[in-house]
Amino acid sequence: MNFAELAAFAGRNPILSSALAGLTLAILGMEAMRLLRGGHRLAPAALTALVNREDALVLDVRVAADFEKGHIPGAKQLALAEVKPEHKLLAMAKSRPVVLVCKAGQSAEGAASMLRKAGFERVFVLDGGIDGWQQAGLPLAKGR
């Protein structure tokens, strides 16, 4: 399909063309916002490797009740509102990789950006959050 055919199609189908353009802009906008917030994403398998090779600190930023129902083995629970560079868990881990985990991988991005601005060099957000972890078939620990 050349440009002339594409333009003719768009002229014959203005609603469909507008919807496609709108969706494309929305996707590009969301990706730009994600990058501007500083959310370096980490796949579940890469998280396992990072913990094993570099002793990454995994912080689950969900509420305590959700954490107790199921969390990544070895993760520490720290409510999203408490994620501050001076918190004792984070102050000791400034030179380590830090991975933030939320439910679906969205709400942790703001905290990741804040930590990066505070000088934490290796901050990641688990792609897909705890839901992505489960979809990858990886185990959860229960309780505290």
Can you annotate each of these PLM segments?
Residues L59:
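Conserved beta/loop motifs at nucleotide-recognition and modification sites
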Residues M1-A46, L50-A56, A64-P97, K103-R144:
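Rhodanese-like catalytic fold shared by cysteine-dependent sulfurtransferases
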